[in-house]
Amino acid sequence: EITKGLQNRHISLWQSHGKYYKNDKGEWGWQRPRLFCTTEDLFTQSFILPYVIPMLENAGANVYTPRERDTQKNEVIVDNDTRNGSIYLEMKSRKARWEKTDGYGFAQRKPVYEDGENPFLTGSARFTRTEKKKNKAFAEWIPTIPETGSYAVYVSYQTLPNSVSDAKYLVFHKGGVTEFKVNQRIGGGTWVYLGTFEFDKGSNDYGMVVLSNESSENGVICADAVRFGGGMGNISRGTVSGLPRYLEGARYSA
C-alpha cells in the first residue's frame, strides 16, 4: 500500500483531443492541424498513455480519462443482460442473494449508437448485501477473448444509497490474480478502469473478473457489465469514424 504520494487522489486527465465529426463538412476530422507529419491529437497521447498516466498511477493516484486509453482494437463486453457469447455467473450465499436494482444498468442492445443514446440506461444491474467473511456470494464475468493480447479491464455498476467503498474485484489473467478495492459510492453508470492485462484467446478460467461480497462495511455491492479492450468507435455521427476508439474525442466515449 502506498502511504504517501498520490494515494487516494483522483485525477481527470485528457491525453489529447481526438477525432470528431465536423457538422459543417459532414466528415470526421482531427481537432488540431497537421504539423511535422503528425497532429497534436495523435502526438500528445504517444507519451501521456504509456508514460505520464502510469507514473501517476504508480504514485498511488486513480486516473480517469474521458477518452479511451486502450489501444486494443478488440472489445468484449460481458453483462447480465446480453452475454454475446461470453459467460456471466452469480453465486449466492446463505445470507446474501443477488437481486435486480431499481434503477437502470448497462445493456449492449445494438452495435452502433446514434448521438444522445446511452447504453447505461437500457439494461439492468444486480446487487447483494455485503458480508465480512471470505468466499461468500460472488459474480463472475468470463469473456470469450477473440485474440491473445493485452486488454484494458473496465467494470461498471450503479451507485446506490448504501453502496460500500471497498467492493472487492479479482482479475484473473495470464500473469496471475490482481485484487482491486473499488469505491462504489462514486463512479456509477460509466466505465471504471481497473488495469491492463494479458489474456489468452478463447474462454478460460484464468481469464475472468470476479466480484465478491466480502467487505469491511455493512451495505451492498452492485454488479453490472465488464468490458475487456478499447474496441472500435461505435458512435454514429453521419457515420462511424472507422477508427479505434482511442483515436476519437471524449464525446464518443463513456
Locate predicted features.
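Short beta-strand-plus-loop segments that form exposed binding edges in beta-rich domains
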Residues: V209-V220
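Non-catalytic propeptide/linker segments at domain boundaries
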Residues: E1-G29, G229-S253
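Extracellular carbohydrate recognition and processing domains
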Residues: K174-S203
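Short, surface-exposed beta-strand/strand-loop-strand elements in extracellular ectodomains
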Residues: T159-T178
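Extracellular beta-strand elements of beta-rich domains used
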Residues: L194, D224-F228
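Glycine- and acidic-residue-enriched helix-capping/strand-helix junction motifs
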Residues: N23-F47
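A short beta-strand element within beta-rich, extracytoplasmic domains
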Residues: F127, A137-P161, V226
